[in-house]
Amino acid sequence: NAGAVFLCLETISRGKKVIVSRGELVEIGGSFRIPDVMAKSGSILKEVGTTNRTHFNDYENAIEHDTGLLLKVHTSNYSVVGFTADVSLEELVALGAKYQIPVMEDLGSGTFVDFSKYGLLKEPTVQESVAAGADVVTFSGDKLLGGPQAGMIIGKNDLLERIKKNPITRALRIDKLTLAALESTLRRYRNIDREIDSIPTLRMLTLPLAHIETKAKELAKKLENIGDARMSVTLIDLSSRPGGGALPLLKLPSKGVGIKVQGISANTIEKQMRSNELPIIGRIEEDLFIMDLRTILDDELSIIKNALDNMLKKA
């Protein structure tokens, strides 16, 4: 998505000012910062408002003869709460139309799914951005979308044609394997209500707690059947966090299995599991090696059992 944002800015607003709220100057992993990407694109950052409150007149008062873009950035990896105010995309689109300035929204993680239908926190969808009238929308092909890492750009034909003709487009284009993986993912969105389980990210986010608990009990039973008196197995209530720069406030109730082995530290267990032929990633809490069953597939339970069994035999 950083590439998509850069390409849009370089095409639309190079040498011109881009108006953006101070509360939306995001940084994600790898030190990707909106101001830095904007500077590299040749665009000129024009900050408005404050960290927690930005109003419509902040944008309008900042418009000058050399304003090239109104930019709205979804804070997909953090949330500003409390005494806050922001300007909706619809309001920015109306302002852009009044002064004939294009409006771009960077959704960051991006999603086609209304997660509130599944009892999760609402995230703005790509469809909503398009319906609101944004001239250009950028978002990630991975993260909440569930496909390969890629930057996505959708929008109005005139701007997309300019973007496609930019020589930098060829330098940033994805390879054919990534394109094939992306197409395969997007095809599933044609019937997403039926296909949601076929996209691992979405399946894990929407997995019912009862199903997770059943898996946790099954894994605990498999581990107990190893029959090593040194190992204790505990069922644990957990909270899953999506991560990946998305849904920062969401905590999903989940179930986990905690492992403790006499004479072997939790750090050693974690290292051994991570070094397995198929790496097994857990976390450590209170000297327990813990696995969240939300992210473990049904056919992976035996892999975990065999890895622990082999570790115990060598210890």
Regions found by a protein language model. Give the residues of each.
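Short, flexible, solvent-exposed loop/turn segments with mixed acidic/basic and small polar residues
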Residues: 7, 35-36, 139-142, 193, ...
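Structural motif of enzymes handling amino- and sulfur-group chemistry
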Residues: 158, 166-167, 174-224, 237-239, ...
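Short Gly/Ser/Thr- and Asp/Glu-enriched loop/turn motifs at secondary-structure junctions
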Residues: 145-148, 252, 283-289
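Flexible, glycine/charged-enriched surface loops at secondary-structure junctions
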Residues: 100-101, 141, 171-177, 192-199, ...
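Conserved PLP-binding catalytic core of the aspartate aminotransferase-like
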Residues: 204, 209-213, 217, 226-272
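Conserved PLP-enzyme active-site core in the AAT-like
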Residues: 1-189, 224, 307
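Short glycine/threonine-rich loop-to-helix capping motif typified by GTGT followed
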Residues: 117-119, 210-211, 245-250, 295-301
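PLP-dependent enzyme catalytic core of the Aspartate aminotransferase-like
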Residues: 259-315
